[in-house]
């Protein structure tokens, strides 16, 4: 359920704002979305893994807080990350 180094680097390169950006809200949302996706697949196979389910809910909450922060700071950055990651219909 964790991301390996190559996956992290690919996400950083795709969503960074400048050359040395590794911690912007966009990068964090992209990494959380990837981890959420992997954990969701795990939970579909392992229905009774309640501790992983709790971790999934925490990650979803963290992503929601980051997206709210982005929406408050810059609506353009918010809509860009939403469309890139296909989070909302």
From Swiss-Prot:
One of the primary rRNA binding proteins, it binds directly to 16S rRNA where it helps nucleate assembly of the platform of the 30S subunit by binding and bridging several RNA helices of the 16S rRNA. Forms an intersubunit bridge (bridge B4) with the 23S rRNA of the 50S subunit in the ribosome. It holds the Pfam family Ribosomal_S15. Part of the 30S ribosomal subunit. Forms a bridge to the 50S subunit in the 70S ribosome, contacting the 23S rRNA. PANTHER family: RIBOSOMAL PROTEIN S15, BACTERIAL AND ORGANELLAR, SMALL RIBOSOMAL SUBUNIT PROTEIN US15M. The keyword Transit peptide does not apply. Disulfide bonds: none annotated. Keywords: Ribonucleoprotein, Ribosomal protein, RNA-binding, rRNA-binding. This is Small ribosomal subunit protein uS15. SUPFAM superfamilies: S15/NS1 RNA-binding domain (SSF47060). SMART domains: Ribosomal_S15. One of its GO terms (cellular component) is cytosolic small ribosomal subunit. It comes from the Bacteria. One of its GO terms (biological process) is translation. One of its GO terms (molecular function) is rRNA binding. The keyword tRNA processing does not apply. It comes from Prochlorococcus marinus (strain MIT 9211). Gene3D superfamilies: 6.10.250.3130, S15/NS1, RNA-binding. Residues 1-23 are annotated as: Disordered.
